[in-house]
């Protein structure tokens, strides 16, 4: 799975890499589910909540953060999104755990990359006039729509496979347009494990376990392995 990642690439570099205007973003060393994070869709970088809430959901509790590429078209939660609402999730590294030890996996030059994502727009139910309690999800009288996303996963490459049985779909730059705009069959053909030729992994501090920690020390190598 993909449950934590980093994105400390500058706004200008992200804009250059993805062909957008510079986003309003700050360096992130511990991106976690439930947070508002950058995604690329419609030619711009916006922020969406990590954890996909489908349009038909009654509430926004326990949203899935990952979607398996192999079954994504079969699951009601993901089927419409993968057909019509694909996105790129910028990152420059991600974390996986092995026997309690967290590792950061990245390219050896820390270059940014795109993980395959899907997104949704959910309208929270409104509270009916005159009722004293909120509707599902604890929403207010005039709730704002929630934009949310999930990261697509696939089998791991050799490097990640030493740590976990799944990994995020990392798209080659040549595949990004197909993922965003191509027929779903062609898009899913892009969802194999990314080669590990120039990827590296090193152990990091268990401070990354707590999503409240978010500073550069989290990506530093430790002596755990």
Spans of model-derived segments:
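Short linear sequence motif anchored by a di-proline
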Residues: 1-225
